[in-house]
Amino acid sequence: MEKYMSLLTRIEEMMQSTSYQEGDRLPSIRQLSARYQVSKSTVIRALQELEKRHLIYSVPKSGYYIVKKSGKSKSGQPGPIDFATSAPDPDVFPYLDFQHCINKAIDTYKNDLFIYGTPKGLPSLIRVLRKLLATQQVFADERHIFITSGVQQALSLLCAMPFPNGKEKIAIEQPGYHLMVEQLETLGIPAIGVKRTEEGLDIAKVERLFQTESIKFFYTMPRFHNPLGCSLSERDKQELVRLAEAYDVYLVEDDYLGDLEENKKADPLYAYDLSSHVIYLKSFSKMMFPGLRVGAAVLPEALTDTFYAYKKLNDIDCSMISQAALEIYLKSGMYGRHKEKIRDSYKERSLRLHQAIRTHRQLGSGRFTFSSGQAPCMHTHLVLPQDLPASRVIHRLEKQGVLLEAIDRHYLSDYPKENLLKINISNVKTEDIERGVKLLMSHL
């Protein structure tokens, strides 16, 4: 990495510290040069780059100042506390870095980005993804990696296409990813719910299901489950893979937040798969921004031809500009730095939430079950007593400016719903979490 880029990153970290506010003046060029032991020309280049990214602005004969963000409340009144939205925080979107990558992609690939690509994806991006996946214990040949328009497209194709096992039903965790639930029910695909809790899965029940039902694949989120926020134990993962091989059931592993994992011993299901029964899905939308509709699917050899045929019918290619920009973003190291920033942000919010719940639960009856779960994670949940419906709590808190969302849409329509209150922290400012939790606890 060039010196000025290293310095740029350190200045950004300094700007994000609690001692600096928007509109504050940065240390002088001379002071920055002395502090970081670099030349003045390196400091100037780093500051100029930050200015290009609209993070700072210069005042002649005065210095550089931190840009004030637009969209702040001018009334000084606190806005709603949004524990409902699961999209990533817009304040941490890497807009400017990715804009640079888009411009660089156009300069590099020129006309190639504006003609039809290939259904499989941009070959240079696939090569970069193969290396990235290998760092996460997903060792795959390039011919098994497909670029899709997000995980949602991959799921749609997998639901539609026939599998080598000749089976028809799809098993899905309950509660589970709401858009997958919606897809199964809208398309009338036979689906069977599998209970998922903080403790994981009942492996004995999963085995009976695989034995007695015609299960095409089991869709699961082993890490950072949406909406529960918990992860499967390594033992459960190994047992799932064993059962998949024994009963010829495929596992569709949605690892949408795998980049948040801090435990180096926590591997994806794919790492345990020796019989080619795991389909691995990766997304960038929750780590970067929802509008980046680029995902990856890693498929066993037996599925690649069929997936390719269905993908080609579904669309000619995923956005070539987005693919090329993502390739540059990954190769440049920007994604690695952004990932650390996101991980730190969610970890701080998760820990603040867990601490606030423990501290303030006595404000109400305290009749709920809560596991502190994992940090960092966007999601967590409370198990409420049956005489306190989650819908009632949500309605009362909405009147006080605290937004929560019912969990019903995470269940199949014929599956018994539990009285759970899901909580997302991705769009709640750290300083608002305690106030929101106090209001929540007072209604429980």
Curated annotation (Swiss-Prot):
BP terms from Gene Ontology: alpha-amino acid metabolic process; biosynthetic process
Modified residues (N6-(pyridoxal phosphate)lysine): K286
Molecular functions per Gene Ontology: DNA binding; DNA-binding transcription factor activity; pyridoxal phosphate binding; transaminase activity
Keyword annotations from UniProtKB, A to Z: Aminotransferase, DNA-binding, Pyridoxal phosphate, Transcription, Transcription regulation, Transferase
Transmembrane segments: none
Family matches, as Pfam families: Aminotran_1_2, GntR
Keyword DNA-binding: yes
Entries under CDD domains matching the protein: AAT_like (cd00609), WHTH_GntR (cd07377)
DNA-binding region ranges: 29-48
Record PANTHER family: HTH-TYPE TRANSCRIPTIONAL REGULATORY PROTEIN GABR (PTHR46577:SF1)
Family statement drawn from the similarity comment of this UniProt entry: In the C-terminal section; belongs to the class-I pyridoxal-phosphate-dependent aminotransferase family.
Protein name listed in UniProt: Uncharacterized HTH-type transcriptional regulator YcxD
Originating organism: Bacillus subtilis (strain 168)
Lineage of the organism: Bacteria, Bacillati, Bacillota, Bacilli, Bacillales
Underlying gene: ycxD
